[in-house]
Swiss-Prot record:
PROSITE patterns: COA_CT_NTER. A zinc finger (C4-type) spans 225-247. The gene is accD. Binds 1 zinc ion per subunit. Belongs to the AccD/PCCB family. Pathway: Lipid metabolism; malonyl-CoA biosynthesis; malonyl-CoA from acetyl-CoA: step 1/1. Component of the acetyl coenzyme A carboxylase (ACC) complex. Biotin carboxylase (BC) catalyzes the carboxylation of biotin on its carrier protein (BCCP) and then the CO(2) group is transferred by the transcarboxylase to acetyl-CoA to form malonyl-CoA. This is Acetyl-coenzyme A carboxylase carboxyl transferase subunit beta, chloroplastic. GO terms for biological process: fatty acid biosynthetic process; malonyl-CoA biosynthetic process. Its EC number is 2.1.3.15. InterPro entries: AcCoA_carboxyl_beta, Acetyl_CoA_COase_Trfase_b_su, ClpP/crotonase-like_dom_sf, COA_CT_N. GO terms for cellular component: acetyl-CoA carboxylase complex; chloroplast stroma. It catalyses: N(6)-carboxybiotinyl-L-lysyl-[protein] + acetyl-CoA = N(6)-biotinyl-L-lysyl-[protein] + malonyl-CoA. Zn(2+) binds at residues 225, 228, 244, 247.
Amino acid sequence: MEKSWFNFLFSKGELEYRCELSKSMDSFAPIEKTPISQDRAIYDTDKNLYDWGERSSYYNNVDLLVSSKDIRNFISDDTFFVRDSNKNSYSIYFDIQNQKFEIGNGLSDLEVFFYSYRSSSYLNNRSKSDNDPHYDPSIKDTKYDCNNHINSCIDSYFRSHICIDSHFLSDSKNYNESYIYNLICSKSEKIRESQNCKIRTNMNRSDLIQDFDITQNYNQLWIQCDNCYALIYKKALKLKLNVCEQCGYYLKISSSDRIELSIDPGTWNPMDEDMVSTDPIQFHSREEPYQNRIDSAQKKTGLTDAVQTGTGQLNGIPVALGVMDFQFMGGSMGSVVGEKITRLIEYATTEFLPLILVCSSGGARMQEGSLSLMQMAKISSVLCDYQSSKKLFYISILTSPTTGGVTASFGMLGDIIIAEPYAYIAFAGKRVIEQTLKKAVPEGSQAAESLLRKGLLDAIVPRNLLKGVLTELFQLHAFFPLNKNEIK
């Protein structure tokens, strides 16, 4: 159980909030974007408190003025400590998911305050016409009413910062809809360390287990951002091209959606759709046979393997397009993937078509052994003929993640290499490098922005601009839209 401290100052018959909720026992930095001015701070080393100096703002009831990015601090089953201006300490136990809120250690003093506040002449002389939003005549001197009042104040705060109805988040009949599940839509303090890096770096995975369990029941309606963990309505996400509107993170996009985004409607002609993988080396696996994994991936994605290839028109320009799908066994490159890409390049060479390959892969497929590794050389060989002999134009688009054998072969052979923002691009993963070299890999060194600065990429292009950029590049290289008379 995590324990955190925050302070209240009881004075002048009113309640003044003096200290924002600290992130943990080891972190006492103030929370940003609070409506209270921050004049001076006092650090109490005896009790590990981060105390605040004089404030000019007073509040008539217990409103927790923490910023929305620290809602995560109110985790289920959490104990906080409160102390008043007389240094009297109280423990407050929160279990928002199970609707528990308890006050201990000197409760009577806290109750006296609420009773005296309710009975003060300031409140008794107040007329209803004052329309004070903080006035609540329901406050009484009992533990039950005190708890309910603070509960309602906390709940009102959550509702003002989270725009998701709680009945979407729980199917329990006993779940109180007045409580918002506190882990949804919160933001990490390190989402945006710089303008060029929005990748979450400081999040305990165990804190998010319940989030994932909840969203699994509603995955046909909602999807959760991998970066800020906000819940996003699937239909709205598709309109945003799978870009999280909360943090700008680029979520993975299926190969079918990518084709729909890039190719003009009604012009897509798929190739080699009936080509499927077998188990050429009889790969042995204790967990799941290779053929079973292929079958389950086919049922999950509706694809025969991890790449779709074909021809179509991009703003009227005929192109050959191959799109890898990470949802199919991590986009791994086996014999079928290599063969389909090879045939696509050969067809583009014969028909003098510009070529686009969209990469999203974890590398060579280990279940096929050396057969998967030889695909690197096979694809590179036909690309050499396409680029060097025929002088045709190949654009490589790297999405997150692009690693392993794909990076080491056709991923980095494009005449123009384009990456999506914040894409993870590497040959070997961070963990492999650190275990092999016994050296730490600098944070962000394998991100697209870092590779662009090092000269390994030509451009980083957002999804909404990609089709227009490709059109201009093709026209620059003398590939123009078909005339209306030429379109069949």
